[in-house]
A protein has these predicted regions:
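Structural signature of beta-strand start/N-cap positions in the alpha/beta core
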Residues: 46, 53-55, 78-81
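Short alpha-helix in the alpha/beta-hydrolase fold that links the catalytic acid
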Residues: 36, 43, 52, 66-75
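Short beta-strand/loop motif that positions the catalytic acidic residue
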Residues: 50, 56-58, 62
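Catalytic active-site module of serine/aspartate enzymes centered on a nucleophile-bearing elbow/loop
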Residues: 78-122
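Hydrophobic alpha-helical packing elements
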Residues: 34, 73, 100-103
């Protein structure tokens, strides 16, 4: 339920099984260390220092990284953009690849245009 919504699992059993098997094959010690790092390192005070464009893509039903957490990051980083994918859980790139790609493409196009206008003429 954390990685995919029940509806996605029912509609895409093969994809879900493949992803879950890949996660299960991960080294237990390394995965536990990663989870510990994520749980114990509070970087909220550092967010305001981020000065590069930031796009956050959240799944509406993501219990691992709730939208409230994403909203906190977006509010703390100047100019950050938060996009929420409806009916998606944590694995938004798997559950909604086209939507994710379109969001990334639009973000990169916007950032590229802004950067070009900020560059000095040679």
């Amino acid at each position: 339920k954390r990685w995919f919504t029940p509806a996605f699992k029912a509609a895409n059993p093969r994809v879900t099984t493949t992803i879950m098997e890949g996660l299960a094959a991960a080294d237990d010690h390394s995965y536990a260390q990663l989870c510990r790092c994520l749980a114990h390192h509070d970087l909220r005070a550092d967010l305001r220092d981020i000065r590069c464009p930031l796009l956050l893509i959240a799944g509406e039903r993501d219990s691992s990284t709730p939208i409230a957490n994403q909203e906190l990051v977006a509010a703390s980083v100047p100019g950050a953009q938060l996009s929420v994918i409806p009916e998606a859980a944590h694995q938004v790139t798997v559950a909604a690849p086209d939507t994710t790609a379109n969001l990334l493409r639009a973000f990169m196009d916007r950032v590229t245009r802004q950067t070009r206008t900020e560059l000095p003429d040679d």
